[in-house]
Amino acid sequence: MTDKNPEYDFLWCPGCGDFGVRRALEFAMEELNITHERTMEENVVVAGIGCSGNTVHLLEGEQPYGFHGIHGRSLPVAMGTKMSRPDLNVVVVAGDGDFLSIGMEHIAPQAARNLNITAIIMDNGVYGLTKGQSSPTTTIETVTNSTPFGKMEVAVNPLDLYLTLGVTFIASGYSVKPRDLAKLMVRGMEHPGFSIVHVASPCTTYNDNFTQLKGSAKLGIQPTAWAIPEDHDAGSKTAARGIIDEGGVPLGVVYEDTSRPSFDAQFDAVRTKNPQKSPADLLAVFDL
C-alpha cells in the first residue's frame, strides 16, 4: 500500500504529542525495514479507540497495513494477527485510557505468553478524544470534565504494572524527541517477546503538561522527565524497580529479560513436533 485513506480527514490538535510518536514510529519501521530487508507492507499497526488510534490513518509515505479495532481490544487483535502471520512485524498503538482501562485485562495474559509483539502507549493522562475526562493515569485530585471536584482514585503507575505482570521489555520515552523515541521502539521491536514502549505524550487541549515534563528555568519548574543513567542494569528487576520508584518520567530502557522464550518460538516448536495435516490427509484415513 502506498496511499493513506483519502476519505479520512481526522487531524490531531496543533502541538499534540502524538505527532512526535507517529514520526518516531515511521523512523523505527523505516530503519528495521532496511535492517531486515522487508517491505513496509510486512508491518501491521493495530490500534484501539482514541486519539492514538488515528495513527493507523496518519502515517506518511509508504503505508503499513493498519487495523483500527475496538476500544481496549488491540492486544487480542494483535495476537490473532501475529499467530496467523508470524512473519509480520506487529505493532500496537494505544492510549492510556484505551490500554490501561478497559484494555488492562489483556496485558497480563500477553505478559504470561510473551508473544513477540510491540505495544506503543501514548499517555496523555486524560481521555482526549471524548473531550477531557480523567483516565487511569490522571493524578488524584485533578479536576477534569468528569471529575469536577477532583479525581478520587489513585493513578495507575504503568511502568510498575508492566514490571509486576512480567512484561519482558519495558521502555519509557517522551514524544518531543522522535529520534530518541524511535531508538526505543527499534529496541522493543527487536526484542524476542512482548515489549511495551510507554510514551509521555502531552495533550495540548485538555492536559498540557509539556512544561512540567520539560521543565522551565524561567518559571522555576524542575523537569519530571529524566534520562536513565547509562550504567543502569536493565536486566535486573531490582534495578528496574529502583528506576520506577524514582518517579517522574524516566527516559530509556527500564527492563529487558531475554531469558524467556517467546510464545511464537514455543508454538513453532509444537508445530514441528506435531505437524498439521491437510483436509485431504485427514480424509485419506477413511475408506471413502
Model regions and ranges:
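Active-site diphosphate/adenylate-binding microenvironment
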Residues: 2-70
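Conserved thiamine diphosphate
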Residues: 3, 87, 135-188
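Flexible, low-complexity linker and terminal segments
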Residues: 7, 203-288
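Short coil/turn connectors at secondary-structure junctions
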Residues: 8, 39-43, 62-65, 84-90, ...
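Short catalytic-loop micro-motif centered on adjacent basic/acidic residues
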Residues: 12-14, 92-94, 169-174, 196
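Glycine-rich beta-alpha junction loops
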Residues: 49-51, 124-126, 200-206, 257-260
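Thiamine diphosphate
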Residues: 49-128
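Short, surface-exposed, charged loop/turn segments at secondary-structure junctions
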Residues: 133-140, 178, 185-194, 207-222, ...
